[in-house]
């Protein structure tokens, strides 16, 4: 007896439409392959040295008036909000980045600048005070303390 629906080697029904579209998805110049051109990647660079703490961000997709930089305690928050409305619709874009500043940053002298390429740089000089580090014993469940080899007791720029 022959089958009314011969086996074709691929599923039938619901998934057939998706399989028929597969050649279009695989095209080299499809919209999905150009996604990085549509939504730019933000550059995020953090530098923490003995002299300063520095954050660099690519904010070229935002106007300066669409950006906010706030400092609450030692938490630095950078926000951007962009909105475009036309008769055909609207688009919104936003981001938020937070950084916890080291304890030895001079909070009164933080400087923010945006260059003509849209790169935001936030420089926070450090006060130069050293942080003392002391080794703590590690206790095992048996009650023994493991002592560490002594190391330098003063560090700068390590957090």
UniProtKB/Swiss-Prot annotation:
Residues 33-141 form the sHSP domain. GO terms for cellular component: cytoplasm; cytosol; nucleus. GO terms for biological process: determination of adult lifespan; embryo development ending in birth or egg hatching; protein metabolic process; protein refolding; response to heat. It holds the Pfam family HSP20. One of its GO terms (molecular function) is unfolded protein binding. It comes from the Eukaryota. PANTHER family: HEAT SHOCK PROTEIN HSP-12.2-RELATED, STRESS-INDUCED PROTEIN 1. Belongs to the small heat shock protein (HSP20) family. This is Stress-induced protein 1. It comes from Caenorhabditis elegans.
